[in-house]
């Protein structure tokens, strides 16, 4: 009989220990337990081959992006001028999906009839060209030029009426110094007059200082955390940035979640709106909390 109970408990023990040792972020609850940063929404793992949201898409990824578009307006409650709303997107490390989300947040806003500019400002490691077709010239070429107009480097996305892109351009030898130039300030001053929204794909904050250099241009910062990739302990980085106010008006987006975990009506409402849909688990999963 003892051997029977040992055999019965052994698999549960293995599962429990495995769960105990797994420190990766899984759900919204993991983010909220480890940070005090407002939670804007989560984006389920995409099952579509399309890299950019389409107007008729009804996938869980597309719906989550529409909810994030709605929730974004709460971040602009204190904005008093009529200039473009500037949304900066960053993460702790590369490969957390910030470029994917930058492009799709810009596309989702453009589908609502707003004039949107996407800027590639991760000039050390540009990735926009992996998702959409853009020229090799762009922001850095403009910043190093003396007689070029910014309009020469901005392109319109063919399948959108109001979606424009300023690519990163060639990788410069001195990215930090380039981003510190007054020409960047003048550029944003000009662009804010011509668009409704500006979405900026910036560098990961865990690696370089580039994002902090341009942070003053942002109305809000979306901090992307990728589920099953980032360690919970790494959340101390955005938490410190939030409390030290190094990135203005921060909110977290949890990317690449399992669609059965936390996705449902109102799942993305990080400001107390809607009802969280909880996944129903078997008794043994509830017992061991995995």
Where are the regions that the model predicts?
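Inter-motif core of Ras-like GTPase G domains
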Residues: 207-228
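Conserved dinucleotide-binding and phosphotransfer motif residues
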Residues: 112-113, 194, 217
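Nucleotide-state-sensitive switch-loop elements of NTP-binding domains
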Residues: 143-171
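Well-ordered beta-strand positions
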Residues: 197, 220-223, 251
């Amino acid at each position: 009989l003892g051997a029977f109970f040992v055999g019965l408990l052994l698999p549960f023990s293995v599962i429990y220990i495995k769960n105990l040792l797994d420190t990766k972020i899984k759900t919204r609850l993991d983010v909220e337990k480890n940070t005090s940063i407002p939670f804007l929404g989560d984006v389920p793992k995409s099952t579509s081959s399309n890299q950019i949201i389409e107007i008729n898409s009804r996938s869980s990824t597309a719906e989550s992006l529409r909810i994030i578009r709605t929730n974004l307006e709460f971040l602009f409650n204190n904005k008093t001028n009529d200039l473009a709303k500037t949304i900066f997107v960053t993460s702790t490390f590369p490969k957390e999906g910030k470029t994917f989300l930058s492009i799709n947040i810009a596309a989702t806003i453009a589908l609502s009839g707003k004039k949107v500019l996407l800027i590639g400002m991760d000039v050390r490691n540009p990735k926009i060209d992996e998702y959409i077709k853009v020229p090799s010239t762009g922001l850095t070429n403009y910043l190093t030029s003396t007689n070029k107009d910014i309009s020469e480097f901005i392109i319109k996305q063919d399948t959108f009426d109001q979606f424009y892109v300023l690519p990163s351009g060639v990788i410069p030898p001195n990215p930090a110094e380039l981003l510190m130039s007054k020409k960047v300030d003048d550029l944003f001053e000009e662009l804010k007059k011509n668009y409704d929204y500006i979405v900026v794909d910036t560098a990961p904050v865990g690696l370089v200082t580039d994002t902090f250099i341009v942070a003053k241009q942002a109305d809000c910062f979306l901090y992307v955390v990728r589920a099953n990739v980032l360690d919970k302990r790494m959340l101390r980085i955005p938490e410190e940035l939030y409390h030290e106010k190094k990135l203005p008006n921060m909110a977290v987006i949890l990317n690449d979640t399992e669609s059965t975990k936390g996705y449902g009506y109102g799942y993305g409402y990080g400001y107390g709106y809607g009802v969280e849909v909880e996944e129903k688990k078997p008794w043994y999963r509830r017992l061991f909390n995995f």
